[in-house]
Amino acid sequence: MWKMMIIDDEYFVRMGIRETIDWAVHGVEIVGEADNGTQGLELACRLKPDIIITDIRMPGMNGLDFMRCCREKGLHSQIIVLSAHEEFN
């Protein structure tokens, strides 16, 4: 089974990702959720997920900084960005 994490500051977005798809049918287990990049990084370092779905705009550490820190820490998770954010600088 693939291990997956969801990181988004919006509870209903996390719930939608978690409950809209029957992840187990696709061989995916949701092993953790976080509502900001800092918490997400701590969980990712501990859980070592195969897949991470993250938002960009979040309080504290944003998604871009989160992805940079993941690479610096040697995490090899595949990261999928889902965001309504319009501008990336």
What function would you assign to each model-found segment?
Residues 9-11, 56:
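Generic detector of well-ordered alpha-helical packing
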Residues 41-42, 46-89:
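CheY-like receiver
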Residues 1-3:
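Non-catalytic signal-transmission and effector/linker regions of two-component phosphorelay proteins
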Residues 11-32:
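Two-component/phosphorelay signaling modules centered on CheY-like receiver
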Residues 7-8, 34, 52:
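Conserved sequence signature across two-component system core domains
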